[in-house]
Amino acid sequence: MSRKEQKKAAQTKASRMKMARFGGLALIILIVIIGLIAWSNSGESAVSETAVLAPPHLDGPADAPVKIIEYADLTCSSCRQWHNMGIKEQLQADFGDQISFEYRHFPVITAASPRWAEAAQCAAEQDLFWPFHDYVYENFEPYPTVNDARLQEIAAAIGLESEPFESCLAAGRYDKFIGDAIQRAQSDGARGTPTFLINGQQVFPSYEAMSAAINLLLGS
């Protein structure tokens, strides 16, 4: 074999070794990536399996043609005022089963807001979300603080079983749910409370504006 041929053979061998090393490195990287993805997915599955799945707080038929969503905070002064004006009840009287109301938490007004939202969720486990919601708005001052005495007062007033209610709160069962609720509200365009959506569109929370939007959707 000539020197030229030997040089070419050596270059070819070196090139093959380089490709083999590169291929081996690429395979290792691929295995690491697959492992990371599998680990990530297993972590996500663990979270989703342990996360609390809470049913919606719905007042009205789930299949109503007009769906009204309220993003609100139990410490919110404007939410309390809207509730006590009776607009919801007036709309329900006017439109009946053609509308449904859904309450969604957006607890961002005070430091106590997330705790109130968690307490409402714990009350919902006993099918007492709406009585809890109504009691807070109708009996406490705006921006109420949350403490054991107030929670015991509500429990006695609306018929909550104290032990499971207190256990639910102590366990922090709805911590993640409340955090997710805030993100959901923001993704739906909520920037303050209350924020109302009628079939996905924000509407001013007056009786006139809301009834006009409903009539438009119903074609009446």
Language model features: what each stretch is:
Residues 36-46:
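Hydrophobic single-pass membrane-insertion segments
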Residues 54-55, 102, 165:
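Glycine-rich, flexible loop/turn motifs
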